[in-house]
Swiss-Prot record:
Broad EC category: hydrolase
Catalysed reactions, semicolon-separated: Hydrolysis of terminal non-reducing N-acetyl-D-hexosamine residues in N-acetyl-beta-D-hexosaminides
UniProt-annotated catalytic positions: 176 (proton donor/acceptor), 247 (nucleophile)
Species this chain originates from: Xylella fastidiosa (strain 9a5c)
Record-given protein name: Beta-hexosaminidase
Length: 335
């Protein structure tokens, strides 16, 4: 039901107490939680030991400027860099996307973390928050990359989360700091922004993260608070059967929805399976809000990883060094 954030590199007594609540489905990790590779492995183990229930551990490890784990991890290029190769050599570009996905997912899983919220398949059309996180401005090119990235993450044993549905890339506003409104009709969105999502879903994506963007000609609420977007379009028309995550309720774009409790209930009532409460100062209010609400975590069990190699196993895998070398040769260490 809730995926919460914790404050630092170790767990406080209060955070351990939070994890005992059945409403807490897991924890999302950030740069503030990272000190070293060994420390993340220890923190992941401590989180799992803190509760007898299965716990989902997640991170945003996209590459480029959105990479929470640094020292000891590959300096992954932003997706725009991979996408730029497509015009010259589509086959090579898609192979690099597969390898980018495999490398990212393998390192995250080796650290004891189940999934990275990836890939971004928003269109790269000037949005301040998306920027070079997007593969391309062409929906059909992004669709091809979505398929390759799904395959690469799955090859590493990691579930895939497509984001940010139904598409964040065609508005300028950054929803971390402002409300974003996209006035295009559904017919236009279906021919553009939804094309990569349809491709990713068809390729077997396991989850979708919603956008805090309002599409007033489709529904009056931000998409993550809209049953029309989630139940009618995503699950109904597009046939998606996986897990639906909200984006973080601490972002400025959701302030108009109301209180922490109002945001949590609105997401769940609209059809989100999991609500992200990334700021620790909001966790108590979120837990109070859902007290007594029935928790259904069955959908999440399939996202919790099994059989990861660990770092010793990954470092011994011949694919690891060769893929690292190819990405380094192509992109250097620039992020």
């Amino acid at each position: 039901m809730l995926l919460i954030g914790v404050a630092g590199t170790t767990l406080s007594a209060q955070e351990v107490d939070w994890l005992q609540d059945d409403a807490v489905a897991g924890v999302v990790l950030f740069k503030r939680n990272f000190a070293s590779r060994a420390q993340i492995v220890e923190l992941s183990a401590a989180l799992r030991e803190a509760t007898p229930r299965p716990l989902l551990l997640a991170v945003d490890q996209e590459g480029g400027r959105v990479q929470r784990f640094h020292e000891g991890y590959s300096a992954l290029p932003p997706l725009q860099g991979v996408g730029a190769l497509y015009a010259r050599d589509p086959e090579a570009a898609l192979e690099l996307a597969f390898e980018h996905a495999w490398l990212m997912a393998s390192e995250v899983r080796a650290s004891g973390v189940d999934l990275s919220f990836a890939p971004v398949i928003d269109l790269g059309r000037g949005n301040r928050a998306i920027g070079n996180r997007a593969f391309s401005d062409d929906p059909h090119v992004v669709a091809a990359f979505a398929r390759a990235y799904v395959q690469g993450m799955h090859a590493a044993g990691m579930p895939v989360t497509l984001k940010h549905f139904p598409g964040h890339g065609s508005v300028l506003e950054d929803t971390h700091v402002d409300l974003a409104v996209d006035v295009r009709p559904l017919e236009t969105l279906e021919c553009e922004d939804l094309v990569p999502f349809a491709a990713g879903i068809a390729a077997g994506a396991d989850a979708v993260m919603m956008a805090h963007v309002v599409y007033p000609n489709v529904a009056p609420e931000p998409a993550g608070f809209s049953a029309h977007w989630i139940e009618v379009i995503l699950r109904g028309r597009m046939g998606f059967r996986g897990v639906v995550f909200s984006d973080d309720i601490g972002m400025a774009a959701v302030r108009g929805v109301g209180s922490v409790a109002g945001c949590v209930h609105a997401h769940l009532d609209a059809g989100c399976d999991v609500v992200l409460v990334c700021h620790p100062e909001l966790v108590n209010d979120a837990l109070s809000a859902v007290a007594g609400r029935r928790s259904n975590t069955a959908a999440l069990i399939g996202l919790i990883g099994r059989g990861a190699l660990g770092w010793d196993g990954l470092l011994a895998d011949v694919r690891y060094g060769s893929i690292q070398s190819r990405l380094l040769e192509r992109f250097g260490t620039s992020t």
